[in-house]
Amino acid sequence: MIEVQDPFVGRTLDEKYRVEERLAAGGMGAVYRARHLLMDRPVALKFLHQRLVEDEAARVRFLTEARAAVKLRHPNAVSVTDFGQTSEGCIYIVMELLEGRTLREILSREAPLETARAISIMLQTSGAVAAAHEAGIIHRDLKPSNILITQSADHPAVVKVLDFGIATFSADDDEDVIVPTQTNTVIGTPRYMSPEQHNGAELTPATDVYSLGVILYEMLTGTVPFSGATPAEIAQKHANNAPFSPREIVAAIPPEVERIVLHALEKQPSHRPANAGKFRNELLDTAERLGLEHHAIKSAPDIEVLRDAGVESPSGRLVVDISRLREKRALSSGSNEIKILGAPPAQESKPNNEPSSSSSFIDKLKRILGKPQKSTKHN
């Protein structure tokens, strides 16, 4: 058997990225581990198929999305740091390299999750999506395989949401399906798509809220609200069927949490929370009322604040003394949400308006996308 040599492994791109190995591949491209030679640190390179560059509409949409993505700064969103093109014309994006498990992998082994754990993951996830909505980005393809859970000694259970800004063109796993409609071509994952997305209608941030509701439903119950043998069957159910009550599946789910899930799964976008920030606020308020900070909610950044206000159990889980935590909250300035549940607050996640870094990134992007058939080295 003849082994086919990967065209990128071993190459150095733009005189600073040495490609080391391919990590994953899908219908729309591939992701590689690489090393930034000037900074001596690992990065991830995501290559997009050439056909997306050669299509005029795709170039325009990609430029618009990338302009927003480079301005997005949030601790729960994967960072996009650079952009380039190979001598063959293949476009790639440079991202932070993350190690961990996707939520899909976790659910396949551990679902349903405890309510506190599910809420902790969703607060971090919705915080990143809320920041995207503030920056004018609608993700369009939120699903468990686009949510990575990283873990380390310093920051256990930190969520990273993947594929901001390029989700429309993403197909990195076997969940992705392109669903043609009469009016449009919809790219997404049928089990997590809203009714309006299935129908090819205009999308709003409420579309992402619906997907977040599906993900939270699955974390809590171990199953998605609707499934079927074909995308058309799934679309019909999303449009017309009422989901089973989560508490009918898992009785231990608090009624208040169930109401939030079902609110996000309303058929009409206007009946849902308008954006991820509003959805997250509902979830956070409910978590506080239920006292869920007493339950093993593992933190994202600012874990030390929680540790100062609580103790770790023999199993390594953190139990927080609410009275001490509120004292610390009163003494602190800035956000208090991150100090309660370890989920970065949406209102702190402003778009990055620094003209120097984002402008140079977009200028480079325009130069590359303006000449899809030919490639020259960029500065």
Residue map of PLM features:
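Phosphate/oxyanion-binding loops and surfaces in catalytic or ligand/nucleic-acid-binding neighborhoods
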Residues: 101, 219, 241, 267, ...
